[in-house]
Amino acid sequence: MRLPLLVSVGVLLVALLPSPPCRALLSRGPIPGARQASQHPQPLSFFQPLPQPQEPQALPTLLRVGEEYFLRLGNLDETRAAPLSPAASPLASRSSSRLSPDKVAANFFRALLQPRRPLDSPAGPAKRGTENALGSRQEAPAARKRRSQEPPISLDLTFHLLREVLEMTKADQLAQQAHSNRKLLDIAGK
């Protein structure tokens, strides 16, 4: 009875006691691109309240693009305001400077969020930009007519295809599980 109590009290003391700051972090100079609150970081005690930042930090946003997830820190409205090309950036006038990581990330996400056009489209790059800006409000009448002539897809066919895809993925998962089980048994058997 006393031994588990002493062990748990010891673990709590070790976990709650303030530890000295990491020397590697204190001795290293400022990291380029990182924001420093002060020139000389002071070690924080566990019982000291955390310093409040001057501006509220934005929570990370998880963007889903296709099957991949991208983590974006900061305001998502900045991505729309950021220039897409480095030549349009105010930093491009200085030849020795590079884009900040925030601007690079903003350009990346802005490029991802732009609508895609097929490569064989007759519109040139300048016209594509204006069409993207206008949106799909002004569709060609021929495209509307062609779409109205196509028969709608049957819901039965859609659900049948969905069922087949689900069965195929389930069979694939079972095959992968059997393969990993076989590997584990081979390792354990040796």
UniProtKB/Swiss-Prot annotation:
Please, which domain of life does this record's source organism belong to?
Eukaryota
The places in or outside the cell where this protein is found are: Secreted
GO terms assigned for molecular function: corticotropin-releasing hormone activity
Identify the keywords attached in UniProt to this record, alphabetized: Amidation, Cleavage on pair of basic residues, Hormone, Secreted, Signal
Q: Does the keyword Signal apply?
A: yes
Record GO biological process? negative regulation of epinephrine secretion; negative regulation of glucagon secretion; positive regulation of cortisol secretion; regulation of NMDA receptor activity; synaptic transmission, dopaminergic
Compositionally biased intervals (Low complexity): 41-53
Signal in keyword set = yes
User: What ranges does the record give for the region Disordered, renumbered to this chain?
Assistant: 33-53, 115-151
Identify the propeptide residues: 25-147
PROSITE patterns membership: CRF (PS00511)
GO CC terms on record?
A: extracellular space; synapse
According to the record, the signal peptide region is 1-24
Name the residues that span the membrane: none
Q: In which tissues is it expressed?
A: Produced by the hypothalamus.
> Which residues are recorded as modified (Alanine amide)?
188
In the record, the note on similarity to other proteins reads: Belongs to the sauvagine/corticotropin-releasing factor/urotensin I family.
Q: How does it assemble?
A: Interacts (via C-terminus) with CRFR1 (via N-terminal extracellular domain).
Write out the function statement from the record.
Hormone regulating the release of corticotropin from pituitary gland. Induces NLRP6 in intestinal epithelial cells, hence may influence gut microbiota profile.
Kindly provide the name given to this protein in its UniProt entry: Corticoliberin
- Species name for this entry? Ovis aries (Sheep)
Taxonomic lineage per UniProt?
Eukaryota, Metazoa, Chordata, Craniata, Vertebrata
